[in-house]
Regions:
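Terminal, compositionally biased segments used for targeting/anchoring and flexible tails
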Residues: 1-117
Length: 117
């Protein structure tokens, strides 16, 4: 019963406009060569900067400048902006879903009636 309801919830989330918009925007972001290249480089630089920090060192100023430049580049990309908006909207949906689940758990925890359907 619980597994069925969870799968149904997952199916409904997958059919939601928020998820569909997220999927479309991520597909477009993947297809955008410039944005993908910048995002890969950002990920690489962040990882390298983290290694410096873990060693107790400051990342070189050139690295910080490149990170800033890449962030500015990607933040003005309309495909990236749509992906961020879609992710934010999906995150809001998932927060609401989690609130509904928590509410159901609280209600179920105090209920003396056991339902099997």
């Amino acid at each position: 019963m619980l597994e069925e309801k969870a799968k149904d919830l997952g199916r409904q989330i997958g059919q939601s406009t928020e998820y569909q918009a997220l999927k479309r925007s991520n597909d477009l972001l993947t297809e955008d060569v410039e944005a993908s290249t910048v995002l890969r480089r950002l990920t690489q630089l962040r990882s390298e900067a983290q290694q410096f920090i873990e060693r107790g060192e400051d990342p070189p100023p050139e690295m910080e400048q490149e990170l800033d430049r890449l962030l500015q580049t990607v933040e003005i990309n309309p495909v990236y902006q749509r992906a961020i908006v879609a992710q934010t909207n999906f995150d809001k949906l998932m927060v609401r879903v989690n609130e509904y689940i928590s509410e159901g758990i609280r209600t179920g925890a105090v209920s003396k009636i056991i339902t099997l359907s």
